[in-house]
């Protein structure tokens, strides 16, 4: 049985890793690292995962924590362009009406089966230099990905972050407190 974990890249060949078991909570607890692991629709009432231990290390050191597994065998369910196209067209029309200034189209592709985390983690250093990796494995499901937006950066004994899509100026922060706004912004 593989131990639950979550990671986020913090620099070239540096990754912050949280190891399970994770404590689930509705809010992040001050003074402790936490990972926001929620479903896409933000329906989980306890999306924050506080690891029992954490560390920062290289991708190679992280990959070495995993035993070589069996060959990955995943059955993929491809995204449906027939479902996506009308939603995308609707979003473009809303932008033209001035309802949105930016949209982030999303397609879902999911797979079932087994993966070899060691192999995936060993491949992460070969990502293009402008891509930043993140992922988790938690209670028999997981995700691994990369984004062109730097999520966190090691800075001395701490971490720095940047504003991401969906953020608001501080003067408009109260708008994010309503559930409807939170779902439309996040």
Where are these regions (language model features)?
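Short, hydrophobic/aromatic alpha-helical segments in well-folded domains
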Residues: 87-91, 120-123, 131, 139, ...
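SIR2/sirtuin-family catalytic core signature
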Residues: 113-155
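Cytosolic ligand/metal-binding cores
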Residues: 19, 30-32, 153-186
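Short, hydrophobic/proline-enriched secondary-structure or compact coil segments at domain edges
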Residues: 2-12
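Short, structured patches in soluble enzyme cores that scaffold and shape functional sites
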Residues: 38-40, 107-109, 136-140, 146-148, ...
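Secondary-structure boundary elements
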Residues: 93-101, 126-127, 138-141, 153-158, ...
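Secondary-structure transition/turn motif
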Residues: 11-12, 50-54, 147-149, 163-167
């Amino acid at each position: 049985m593989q131990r639950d974990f979550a990671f986020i890249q913090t620099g070239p060949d540096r990754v912050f890793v949280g190891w399970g078991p994770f404590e689930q909570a509705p809010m992040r607890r001050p003074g402790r690292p936490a990972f926001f692991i929620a479903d896409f629709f933000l329906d989980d009432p306890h999306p924050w995962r506080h690891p029992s231990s954490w560390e920062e290390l290289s991708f190679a050191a992280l990959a070495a924590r995993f035993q070589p597994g069996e060959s990955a065998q995943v059955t993929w369910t491809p995204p449906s362009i027939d479902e996506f196209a009308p939603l995308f067209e609707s979003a473009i029309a809303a932008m033209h009406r001035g309802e949105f200034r930016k949209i982030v189209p999303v397609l879902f592709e999911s797979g079932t089966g087994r993966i070899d985390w060691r192999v995936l983690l060993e491949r992460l250093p070969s990502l293009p230099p402008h891509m930043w990796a993140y992922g988790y494995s938690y209670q028999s499901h997981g995700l691994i990905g990369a984004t062109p937006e730097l999520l966190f950066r090691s800075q001395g004994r701490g971490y720095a972050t940047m504003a991401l899509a969906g953020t608001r100026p501080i003067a408009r922060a109260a708008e994010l407190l309503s559930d409807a706004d939170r779902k439309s912004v996040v």
